[in-house]
Amino acid sequence: MSWAVVFGLLAALLLLLLLTRRRTRRPGEPPLDLGSIPWLGHALEFGKDAAGFLTRMKEKHGDIFTVLVGGRHVTVLLDPHSYDAVVWEPRSRLDFHAYAVFLMERIFDVQLPHYNPGDEKSKMKPTLLHKELQALTDAMYTNLRTVLLGDTVEAGSGWHEMGLLEFSYGFLLRAGYLTQYGVEAPPHTQESQAQDRVHSADVFHTFRQLDLLLPKLARGSLSAGDKDRVGKVKGRLWKLLSPTRLASRAHRSRWLESYLLHLEEMGVSEEMQARALVLQLWATQGNMGPAAFWLLLFLLKNPEALAAVRGELETVLLGAEQPISQMTTLPQKVLDSMPVLDSVLSESLRLTAAPFITREVVADLALPMADGREFSLRRGDRLLLFPFLSPQKDPEIYTDPEVFKYNRFLNPDGSEKKDFYKDGKRLKNYSLPWGAGHNQCLGKGYAVNSIKQFVFLVLTQFDLELITPDVDIPEFDLSRYGFGLMQPEHDVPVRYRIRP
């Protein structure tokens, strides 16, 4: 018998041993469900429809359980009263950095020396708050008008047709790109604005090709053709967002200047800086468009809700100091005086925001539950919270949780409703579209302002209609669970025109 055969047999025996060695539940640990396939466990079910799979597991095991997914043991926690015990736990016990770095490298080919997400967040946080937030908000309003009104005027009078997702995603990402990454250098003319529209459209259409393949990228399931396409798209984006190319742009945000300085201080090459800027384009702009899509679609399908929002915006305009055509900014005090639109946004996010909140278990620990129970977690496992199922879709918390109710987050007096209950106790975490704890989204204020400004402009400056009024709201693209805002399985055709 040759050595090659001997080694082959030994390798096969070792693989068989690894595949047949099954973990057993220890006293004090959550219920364990390994599935029927060695090593893979529930990977196929989880990847096909994470929400459906986790719903079945919750019905079977309760609000905490451990499942085997592709060789990893993942403990899933679905009790919102207990989420704070996870999201504020120190990194020495529950770490979210390792998984973030893994996705950063796998999806965007970004490798940063001595990367510390916590340090990066502390440096970038001031660029998204207070006066810097106001500067971003003002610039976003200007750039939304540039792309939204400018494109429509260029296309001529009358009705224009487009998919609602392309409409929302395209205009918001393009305006967001111009806001964060800069506009054409002075002088500021109609020609420079036209060039901004052309350039930002190029960025969006290229980015969208990558975005469509993002779930496959994250799971490592690209076909040979997909890999070739992804390589070309990434190369194009790296050129569009290279620091050298961006250096000539005007009115770059303080966020961009601070981020580039941060990369330079780490000694990151220009090529890697371009990759990091593509990552940041997705992180800062990738969810606003889908969020606006769902919000507008829910309004178009609910005449009462649409009338309530329009009425609120008309009141805002009546109190404005100048006509909307002359407004160069939408002040924060105006944005903060839209409780109906705030409720609509909160309800839309409740129904469609489905991020995973993950932590790597760095050391064996006891996880305290809000009801007094305690469960042991093993070092090397992964801990997963999925707020989309609970609290956001929990029928004990929300009556008719699958139904869009535009005033769900309003009290009878018109103020914001914050009191929601589960098991007779008031919830602190009653909806978590922005994450929670140490890795809550820093750009929440900027994103909310941007979405509200977009909706304000669309509903006050345009007529917007469904081409088929009785069209059904599309199902989710199930592959996007875990990545933030869900996207539809297919787009919804609309027509729009500037109001006469």
From Swiss-Prot:
It comes from the Eukaryota. Gene3D superfamilies: Cytochrome P450 (1.10.630.10). GO terms for biological process: cellular response to hypoxia; cellular response to interleukin-1; cellular response to interleukin-6; icosanoid metabolic process; negative regulation of inflammatory response; negative regulation of nitric oxide biosynthetic process; positive regulation of angiogenesis; positive regulation of execution phase of apoptosis. Its main location: endoplasmic reticulum. Heme binds at C441. It catalyses: prostaglandin H2 = prostaglandin I2; a hydroperoxyeicosatetraenoate = an oxoeicosatetraenoate + H2O; (15S)-hydroperoxy-(5Z,8Z,11Z,13E)-eicosatetraenoate = 15-oxo-(5Z,8Z,11Z,13E)-eicosatetraenoate + H2O; (15S)-hydroperoxy-(5Z,8Z,11Z,13E)-eicosatetraenoate + AH2 = (15S)-hydroxy-(5Z,8Z,11Z,13E)-eicosatetraenoate + A + H2O. Keywords: Endoplasmic reticulum, Fatty acid biosynthesis, Fatty acid metabolism, Heme, Iron, Isomerase, Lipid biosynthesis, Lipid metabolism, Lyase, Membrane, Metal-binding, Prostaglandin biosynthesis, Prostaglandin metabolism, Transmembrane, Transmembrane helix. Its EC number is 5.3.99.4, 4.2.1.152. InterPro entries: Cyt_P450 (IPR001128), Cyt_P450_CYP7A1-type (IPR024204), Cyt_P450_E_grp-IV (IPR002403), Cyt_P450_sf (IPR036396), PTGIS (IPR027286). Its cofactor is heme. The chain crosses the membrane at residues 1-20. Pfam families: p450. It is found in: Endoplasmic reticulum membrane. It is a single-pass membrane protein. GO terms for cellular component: caveola; endoplasmic reticulum; endoplasmic reticulum membrane; nucleus. PANTHER family: PROSTACYCLIN SYNTHASE, PTHR24306. Catalyzes the biosynthesis and metabolism of eicosanoids. Catalyzes the isomerization of prostaglandin H2 to prostacyclin (= prostaglandin I2), a potent mediator of vasodilation and inhibitor of platelet aggregation. Additionally, displays dehydratase activity, toward hydroperoxyeicosatetraenoates (HPETEs), especially toward (15S)-hydroperoxy-(5Z,8Z,11Z,13E)-eicosatetraenoate (15(S)-HPETE). Belongs to the cytochrome P450 family. This is Prostacyclin synthase. It comes from Bos taurus (Bovine). The gene is PTGIS.
